[in-house]
Amino acid sequence: MDEIQKQLDKSDQLMQKACTHTQIEFSKIRAGRAMPDMLDGISILYYNAMTPLNQVAAITTPDARTLVIKPWERKCIQEIEKAIVNSKLGLNPQNDGEVVRIIVPPLTEERRKDLVKQAKNEAEKGKISIRNIRKDIKETFKHLQKDGASEDTIKRAEEKLQNLTDKHIHNIDNLLTHKEAEILEV
């Protein structure tokens, strides 16, 4: 049935979005080396609007442990520094009037374990999201069966849906494995 295929395609797209969201959340978990995307969640008040940091400054990494933030306008430096201090990243910015420098401290063993736990929580959220999508689509299949779709057709569709679910959960597991390795790398 055409409607069943539409639902399977829809579920695949939604599950892919859940995987992408999980990957974005993983990128926010710092892994001991300086990366510009560590600061993606930080916004500052810029001309009376909350603006992402990467839209008001150039963020570079001159070496593995240093981030340099060069704002387009000098007047933003104090605001940038304050936003970084107030973020939950545990970073200490240093302002020299021209740029804001952040030395990323090496991670302690305890902090690494906390970050792995945080990554596992994000992975679990992604898996739950995928399972909820599966549940919603299965409900749609039940309604289609009541509307006249054959039981065999619905069973085959549910098998395909389960395969999609397994594929995307496996994808999240792979992302988690890579993130754990990145975090635990000394």
Swiss-Prot record:
CC annotations in GO: cytoplasm
Disulfide bonds listed in the record: none
GO biological process: one example: translational termination
Gene Ontology molecular-function annotations: ribosomal large subunit binding
Family named by the database record: Belongs to the RRF family.
HAMAP family: RRF (MF_00040)
Function of the protein: Responsible for the release of ribosomes from messenger RNA at the termination of protein biosynthesis. May increase the efficiency of translation by recycling ribosomes from one round of translation to another.
InterPro entries: Ribosome_recyc_fac (IPR002661), Ribosome_recyc_fac_dom (IPR023584), RRF_sf (IPR036191)
One Pfam family of this chain: RRF
Protein's cellular compartments: Cytoplasm
Key word Membrane present: no
Identification of the protein by name: Ribosome-recycling factor
This protein's UniProt keywords: Cytoplasm, Protein biosynthesis
